Amino acid sequence: MNQSILKIVLVALLLPSFGDIEKEYIQSIPGTKEKVEMVFIPGGTFTMGSEKSEQGHFGDEGPQHQVEINPFWMGKFEITWDLYDLFVARDIDRKRPQQLNGKEVDIDIDGVSGATQPYTEMSFGMGVEGYPAICMTQLAAVKFCEWLSAMTGNFYRLPTEAEWEYACRAGTKTAYSFGDDPADLDIYAWHEGNSGGAYHQVGQKKPNPWGLY
């Protein structure tokens, strides 16, 4: 699996736990216009990692081994600043439903476990609206998922490494989900050669066979 496709990271990948309904759904965020589009990922078994002979192979991609994955949902796009900034500001927390699925929801936090304002403007002037949230720590991404779970009443988390690769492969066995030819990468992803040294709004390229961007 060529690692060029794995550079879209952070809080993009979320998992709800409200039943195996095999279809896409849209998660609305109470009190806002924001939403998260979710894609159903069917369960299955795949070969994780890549062969040493594969172009672009990294040493940590082996040895190859079989992994069984249960069905789950994954975000169609990366999480954008539009939503992540709401988590950091916490201004909409009071608008969340007081009860969800018959259970009290508590997202009270302290100064350690809550989000903290970044030390600099993290988009670095490249754009915010519709752009993927970047440069947070893994802990911040985990806390975002906890916040989103409390706000919506559905369980969200980051994907495991195996779930991430499985979803990126989308049932294929080639270096990329679209084949082995890196010349086609421009159609599906931004990278050093076509990004102009900046990041871009989500959903601007073609999705993989399972509908993930």
List each language-model region with its residue ranges.
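Hydrophobic h-region of N-terminal signal peptides that target proteins for export
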Residues: 11-19
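Short, well-ordered junction/capping motifs at the entry into regular secondary structure
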Residues: 187-213
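Active-site microenvironments of metalloenzymes and redox enzymes
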Residues: 48-57, 68-178, 187
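Sec-dependent signal peptide recognition
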Residues: 2-11
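Short loop/turn microsegments at loop-to-beta-strand junctions
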Residues: 36, 154-155, 207-211
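Short, polar loop/linker segments at the starts of domains and inter-domain junctions
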Residues: 27-29, 48-69, 198-206
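Active-site/binding-pocket entry motifs
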Residues: 45-54, 182, 191-196
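GGW-centered surface loops in extracellular recognition modules
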Residues: 21-40
